[in-house]
């Protein structure tokens, strides 16, 4: 059972219903019928461009053949330079440039939906027998089972005298599930009336370049044999003008433009020789930048070092000498300050004696033996006094009677204190006034803090009642 796609019919029915529904409104407002038709056509075009459906508004699956009759006065330079780019896996009726130059020549094309560029002065005949003569360059395509002429503007450059014409046609790669949808989309072509650009690459094997670019040249008169690694094939005389570009933004490039090809050829990616001095210079600069990033070296310092090596060495020596001097002075200061008392004293009596001897020997001409004897006597007397004072203090502490602690005779004992605060609700405040009526009490409190139910409250005024 054949699969029937109902989505296009659904879209078409919705569009027709809406157009019929607003037809009366357009008539009441005085809008012309052509505006409504243009609206419907625009709607259908938008749905088609959105790729919401496949085979949208396709009435026939037959592909009529389009016969092109080349005139006798057509310049012979057109045929050997004509080129087409078609996807791999498709076949094209073979014909040679010699066949195109014959008097009664014709070519049949069976590409439905693909536009064909027809230059001025050419006549073409459809399968129905209608003959059309072209006076200006046009684009011919076939959609919905009929042949249409699209006069879209395309780029033209004035042709130089005696130069061949280059026509380039690009066709997108077709997925099996979107083959019919892709045939509906018309691709614009650019006819560039200028000589093909001349590439100036270094001496490189042409066969090697073609294999690297995944292109295969097709000889005239032979059927296309697609290559698995390359999705596109080229015919003889193919040109890559710099202005050639796809006008559909949604399509991927068919082949690289001549600029990128020229860049690849000039960069010589196929050469196997040793790298040049520029390559070595780049490697050295990259290694130097890597070292700078590792060691934290500044690029400006490196530049300054390269420009002024002698001054930098002198400044480095001065900085090094100043740093050594500062370190030496700091070490001397640390060695002079020695802890000789307190808990951090780790020096022995011999070290202390040597330090005192060094201090006393600093001024040998001022301090004599008599002065030293007087100092020793004063030290001995002070030591005896301190010993006597310490012994008197110890005797006084032993003979002093023990006294009772303060508040020892209070009525409240220590055991009764916890009972006073054996409650969860505590109020600390000031009493404003208290009223009593028999066993009822009423309290007026102010400026207090209350802990009630495990939560703390601060209040300015409070009233409480109690019975007991």
Swiss-Prot record:
One of its GO terms (molecular function) is DNA binding. Residues 401-416 have a biased composition (Acidic residues). The keyword DNA-binding applies. Residues 215-236, 379-416 are annotated as: Disordered. Residues 380-391 have a biased composition (Polar residues). Keywords: DNA-binding, Nucleus, Transcription, Transcription regulation. Transmembrane segments: none annotated. GO terms for biological process: cognition; transcription initiation at RNA polymerase II promoter. It holds the Pfam family TFIIA. It is found in: Nucleus. Testis specific. Expressed in pachytene spermatocytes and haploid spermatids. Its main location: nucleus. It comes from the Eukaryota. InterPro entries: TFIIA_asu/bsu, TFIIA_b-brl. May function as a testis specific transcription factor. Binds DNA in conjunction with GTF2A2 and TBP (the TATA-binding protein) and together with GTF2A2, allows mRNA transcription. PANTHER family: TFIIA-ALPHA AND BETA-LIKE FACTOR, TRANSCRIPTION INITIATION FACTOR IIA SUBUNIT 1. Belongs to the TFIIA subunit 1 family. This is TFIIA-alpha and beta-like factor. The gene is Gtf2a1l.
